[in-house]
Amino acid sequence: MEEVHILTLYPTLEAAEEAAKEVYKKLPQIKNRAEIFGQQAYMDKDDNITGYEERLLISSAGMSMNYLFDVVKSAGGIYIPAHVDRHSYSVLTNLGFIPDDIDIKNIEISRMTEDVDSFLAARDELIKYNIYRNSDAHYLQDMREAEAYLDISDVSELFGG
């Protein structure tokens, strides 16, 4: 089974929770070993720990890209194949192409690619996508200052509202 990372954005917390329930159902039934993988804490808006997730969340969800796309779309979200420029967990590395049977409008290129224009010039098929750039940070200390931003007055503009 190929593994790819997909970034998803949602118009509301409720929409994100709706999609998360579907993804959670597809995770393997493996208990987290905090001494190996660390704690998986639930936090409130004030960064207080409110509980811990017992199931290991680092595992791959057993679902196809198409299935996830349908989940995201039904929740009103945006589906973005992540770090398509990287050698791991990239749809381009795993499949060699971006499937055309999924209505993908956006892709994400990681901070690892310094010359995005050259990367895109070598791959004509990517020109048609909206490009997002992110730090792909998994830890707070890896987050970087924003190099780009979305010029919108309300989040609903991002979701066609």
Labelled PLM ranges:
Residues 64-69:
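His/acidic metal-ligating clusters that form di-metal
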Residues 47-61:
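Surface-exposed cleft-lining segments at the edges of enzyme active sites
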Residues 31-34:
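Compact, glycine/acidic-enriched structural inserts
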